[in-house]
Amino acid sequence: MTKIPMQPADSTPATFHPNAPTKTNILGMNQEQLGAYFKHIGEKPFRATQVMKWIYQHGVTDFAQMTNLSKGLREKLSEQACIELPEVMHKEFSEDGTRKWVFKVAGGSLVETVLIPADDSKVNGRKTLCISSQVGCALDCSFCSTGKQGFERDLTAAEIIGQLWVANASYMEGVDSTEWQNNVTNVVMMGMGEPLLNYTPVVSSMGLMLSDHAYGLSKRRVTLSTSGVVPKMYELYKDIDVALAISLHAPNDELRNELVPINKKYPLSELIAAAKAYVHDNNPRHKKHVTIEYVMLAGVNDSDEHAQQLVALLDGLPSKINLIPFNPFPHAPYDRSSNNRIHAFSNILNNAGFVCTIRQTRGDDIDAACGQLVGQVADRTRRSAKWQQSIKQRAANEQQSEG
């Protein structure tokens, strides 16, 4: 059974507050939390599963429409509770079928979510949702635009699971059907933020994704991507059974310290050990490998020697390698590796016995590709101002050095 940690008492708005003057947002509560809420308001805890099915399997956010609840309970919930979704500020559609939403969350901050269909011509084909876990990111990876925006705050479980709810709802717009359909088939925690630095809300949200009373996704269809928060990796496989991806991007500590600064705290030896533990100590039926993500930066990490170092580093770790062509952003200090270089790098890995794929860039025309999520639309946050100031300072320094 999946173990879902309870959210801390101050994790608003997805947590029940008995003395709060406003309505309690029950979106994002897991079965245990929602059962406790119903018990507090004088109702049977089993009502939790009924309400969860209405919210996540039928797309209902109006208590009055939850017809298997008594009229009295529906009225009580309408008075005391709410199902508050993140506000859609903007949405864009790419020519390749990719969709991007910009959400406004509590406090006015903006986060982005991306849905990538495997083939937009197939109504029932694979649709992968890339979900954000934080407003901005504190890790400051040098090749990622999100990190350059700085960190503002963690998202709540309601704000995380709400992204999935809205994505499913968007597919129902204009559909001639009286039945709700959950069209998202895969979820990847690869959007804005480092998921393991927002541990409890992220794990609780993934629990809803897996729960038979909510979305009921397969464990193999929910993936968490981490840059390497090693202590939390050891906790993760004890708390929930999902697929793991590692944002590696370099085959040695010297280079990874530059590209992924968290490596200075948790070096590659510790990261790979944690990944091996995740594979071998967890249920082997569901954890046959981890996915290794590796962005291809021209002249930085894409040489034959780097590929050979990567082969040695991953020895003994069941893994699949996903090479990601770099997606440029304004003032990025890197260029994308050439297609020939990427394929040569891939061939070395394949010849060494690894399964290596090259990610197809999707959604780059709407700034929805990997590494491009920054909440650009109507972004007036402190993060944006800080980034703009750094650009001006860099330009001033360059002019000064030229002079």
From Swiss-Prot:
EC assignment: the record states 2.1.1.192
Annotated Radical SAM core domain ranges read 123-364
User: What are the recorded Gene Ontology BP terms?
Assistant: rRNA base methylation; tRNA methylation
Note on how the cofactor is bound: Binds 1 [4Fe-4S] cluster. The cluster is coordinated with 3 cysteines and an exchangeable S-adenosyl-L-methionine.
Disulfide feature? C130-C370
Which principal EC class is assigned to this enzyme?
Answer: transferase
Q: Does the keyword Cytoplasm apply?
A: yes
Q: Record's Gene Ontology CC terms? A: cytoplasm
Query: Region entry Disordered: which residue ranges?
Result: 1-25
Record localization: Cytoplasm
UniProt keyword list: 4Fe-4S, Cytoplasm, Disulfide bond, Iron, Iron-sulfur, Metal-binding, Methyltransferase, rRNA processing, S-adenosyl-L-methionine, Transferase, tRNA processing
Sites binding S-adenosyl-L-methionine sit at: G193, E194, S225, S247, L248, H249, N327
Could you tell me which SUPFAM superfamilies the record lists for this protein? Radical SAM enzymes
Where is [4Fe-4S] cluster bound in this sequence?
Answer: C137, C141, C144
**What GO terms are given for molecular function?**
4 iron, 4 sulfur cluster binding; metal ion binding; rRNA (adenine(2503)-C2-)-methyltransferase activity; rRNA binding; tRNA (adenine(37)-C2)-methyltransferase activity; tRNA binding
Needed cofactors? [4Fe-4S] cluster
Q: Reaction(s) catalyzed by this protein?
A: adenosine(2503) in 23S rRNA + 2 reduced [2Fe-2S]-[ferredoxin] + 2 S-adenosyl-L-methionine = 2-methyladenosine(2503) in 23S rRNA + 5'-deoxyadenosine + L-methionine + 2 oxidized [2Fe-2S]-[ferredoxin] + S-adenosyl-L-homocysteine; adenosine(37) in tRNA + 2 reduced [2Fe-2S]-[ferredoxin] + 2 S-adenosyl-L-methionine = 2-methyladenosine(37) in tRNA + 5'-deoxyadenosine + L-methionine + 2 oxidized [2Fe-2S]-[ferredoxin] + S-adenosyl-L-homocysteine
Tell me which residues this entry annotates as catalytic: E112, C370
Q: Which family does it belong to?
A: Belongs to the radical SAM superfamily. RlmN family.
Entry function: Specifically methylates position 2 of adenine 2503 in 23S rRNA and position 2 of adenine 37 in tRNAs. m2A2503 modification seems to play a crucial role in the proofreading step occurring at the peptidyl transferase center and thus would serve to optimize ribosomal fidelity.
- What other note does the entry give for this protein? Reaction proceeds by a ping-pong mechanism involving intermediate methylation of a conserved cysteine residue.
* Official protein name in the record: Dual-specificity RNA methyltransferase RlmN
